[in-house]
Amino acid sequence: QQFVNRSILNDVFTIDRQQGGQLMGRLFDNSPADINYVVGVFAGRGVGERLNDDTNLMYAARLQWNTIGDPIDFTQSDYKFTQRLQLNIAVGAATNKSNCTAFETDSTSCRRLPGSSYPQLAAGAAPGSQAGLFKVDQAVFEVRSVYKGLYFKHEAHVKRVTDQSVTNNAWPREAEMWGGLVQLGYFPHSVL
């Protein structure tokens, strides 16, 4: 791996390790329409949470067009020294209604956005309290390419959080965040 952990770098946008089910596959292999797809339904509360805080679930989908070559492995470098250029272009989206505005990889995954004054679920609060307080919609556009040790990746994210309570919070009722990352690296196979 040549790059910092993505869930650290794009912390505000990660939906990290949700509990649920998904269907994935590849259609039209090695044709101009070669695509990978993933669709899923999740609890929407993060690591280790099997149940949602209300009756709403998280829905997520990703569609990847393998424009040149095969799908690129989920890695942050071209450690295989790929002999044939590969280029993937993808879009993804997720929607969720819960008391979480962000997630992290630990046992208390459900949390509020860093730096916001959105209300956070109090420790020991009764199950269902503040249930479905936030509506979160987000999307990502991604481009990845590998060729002879060279790895390129670009992600562009947008996330909209709507506070569905009627209280006046210092943080706006609706907030929209944009972010992204670009990575370019080379894995030095000849040195190893």
Language model feature labels by segment:
Residues 1-64, 71-82, 101-129:
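Surface-exposed coil loops of outer-membrane beta-barrel proteins
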Residues 28-32, 68-70, 147-150, 189-191:
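Outer-membrane beta-barrel channels and translocator barrels
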